[in-house]
Swiss-Prot record:
This is POC1 centriolar protein homolog B. Belongs to the WD repeat POC1 family. Gene3D superfamilies: YVTN repeat-like/Quinoprotein amine dehydrogenase. Interacts with POC1A. Interacts with FAM161A. Interacts with CEP44; the interaction is direct and recruits POC1B to centriolar microtubules. Forms a microtubule-associated complex with POC5, CETN2 and FAM161A. Interacts with CCDC15.
Length: 476
């Protein structure tokens, strides 16, 4: 049996939310964790010892999903209040709000380059937004029930979505068409995601199952029935060799995708577990659930996967039918001589969890523009400028390769407002002016279209009148 040092351990726990935790994500530099909750708040936790936590207040209903941008300078959140917010992670609470859907928003996901954002909603639609151009791009409509999750592929060319209509769909982002469809007659998927190299998808099912699909051959590769209740979330290890799942049965389970078996059951939560996520380096994973706790686990097997995945691939020709070797790099595994599952229950051990309830600072959302139902359309049209949905230019991600922005390693590292080159009051005034100009431009455009239609109808009337006169003259 492997030594204890090779098994995952509970390293820390955080308490601060007042209700169930719905989503969690590590920052790209692995120094912070953001969590979302039924209490309508987001919280930002530092992994530094004795650091304070920040509670972000802005949503008016359950926060269902969140994700850091790849650059780490923004945090996107989705809520049952039908809004998506983009947060700048500082003490000012600056965020921008836009209403992209007509029903609760279930998930948000950035593309790998940070230039696109995909949202999924209970209005049965998936919407894609450009962060660089600040524009709504397009909608995807094929689901017939609530869409629970939508994710970009690693290369950004595909989107996978799952719905309560019991289907999983693959979308081509170039032609905006559904190119693949997986159906299930038993249950629906609560969560879906691509593996790190984008050749497979994994689904977390309401039927207690975890399934791995090959999207090139439209084929089910692996099926795991390891939970006794619905599976709510899953996360691939960055190298793709393993998968961690969260379930309403109160456990987090780790699967070895090379050997196709369950290797660990992590028990630390009281009640259902709703979210789980690996850190970007694979050394840590976090879980959250109905007990409002955030648990941080150290995986302790990163050294087992440290070899270059490309060198571990055995197959070099991909024209033939796919094999798991095409999908996951084969690496040495510490449990080759053991087939039983290890259950890890930290409650049985005495552990130093380093201030599980750190001091919390409330950060109220600050919006420079207040929108009412009369100032926006709930569902923007294709190509509509959504500049007014963003707080100010300082919120927009810098996509230029010549611009280097400091990553927010800690909230305290963010420069104060006095150091900004554009005063906030001036930015507010300019944004208000731009909003009014945008409305005027749209109004003029609509008037021009109506005038053109009126001219066309008048021309048709004159032509019909002339034809009528000609007919009357011929009869007389």
């Amino acid at each position: 049996m492997a030594s204890g040092l090779e098994d995952p351990i509970l390293e820390r726990s955080f308490k601060g939310h007042k209700a169930a935790i719905t989503s969690a994500d590590f920052s790209p530099n692995c120094k912070q964790i953001a969590t979302a909750s039924w209490d309508t708040f987001l919280m930002l936790w530092s992994l530094k010892p004795h650091a304070r936590a920040y509670r972000y207040v802005g949503h008016k209903d359950v926060v269902t999903s969140l994700q850091f941008s790849p650059q780490g300078n923004l945090l996107a959140s989705a809520s049952r209040d039908r809004t998506v917010r983009l947060w700048v992670l500082d003490r000012k609470g600056k965020s921008s709000e836009f209403k992209a859907h007509t029903a609760p928003v279930r998930s948000v996901d950035f593309s790998a380059d940070g230039q696109l954002l995909v949202t999924a909603s209970e209005d049965k639609s998936i919407k894609v937004w450009s962060m660089f151009r600040q524009r709504f791009l397009y909608s995807l409509y094929r689901h017939t029930h609530w869409v629970r999750c939508a994710k970009f592929s690693p290369d950004g060319r595909l989107i996978v979505s799952c719905s309560e209509d019991k289907t999983i769909k693959i979308w081509d982002t170039t032609n905006k068409q559904c190119v693949n469809n997986f159906s299930d007659s038993v249950g629906f998927a609560n969560f879906v995601d691509f593996n790190p190299n984008g050749t497979c998808i994994a689904s977390a099912g309401s039927d207690h199952a975890v399934k791995i699909w090959d999207i090139r051959m439209n084929k089910l590769l692996q099926h795991y029935q390891v939970h006794s209740c619905g599976v709510n979330c899953l996360s691939f290890h960055p190298l793709g060799n393993s998968l961690v799942t969260a379930s309403s049965d109160g456990t987090v389970k780790m699967l070895d995708l090379i050997e196709g078996r369950l290797i660990y059951t992590l028990q630390g939560h009281t009640g259902p577990v709703f979210t789980v996520s690996f850190s970007k380096d694979g050394e840590l994973l976090t879980s959250g659930g109905a007990d409002a706790q955030v648990l941080i686990w150290r995986t302790n097997f990163i050294h087992l996967h440290c070899k270059d995945p490309k060198r571990n691939l055995k197959r070099l020709h991909f024209e033939a039918s796919p094999h798991l070797l095409d999908i996951y790099p084969r690496s040495p595994h510490s449990h080759e001589d053991r087939k039983e599952t290890i259950e890890i229950n930290p409650k049985r051990e005495v552990m130093d969890l380093q201030s599980s309830s750190p001091p919390v600072v409330d950060v109220l959302s600050f919006d420079s523009t207040t929108m009412t139902d009369s100032t926006y359309r709930a569902v923007p049209g294709k190509g509509e400028d959504i500049c007014r949905y963003f707080l100010n230019p300082l919120l927009m991600p810098e996509c230029s390769s010549t611009t280097v922005k400091k990553r927010p390693e800690d909230v305290s590292d963010v420069p104060s407002e006095s150091l900004r080159s554009v005063p906030l009051a001036v930015a507010d005034a300019l944004e208000h002016i731009m909003e009014q100009l945008n409305i005027l431009t749209q109004t003029v455009s609509i008037l021009e279209q109506r005038l053109s239609l009126t001219e066309d109808k008048l021309r048709d009337c004159l032509e019909n009148q002339q034809k009528l006169f000609s007919a009357v003259q011929q009869k007389s």
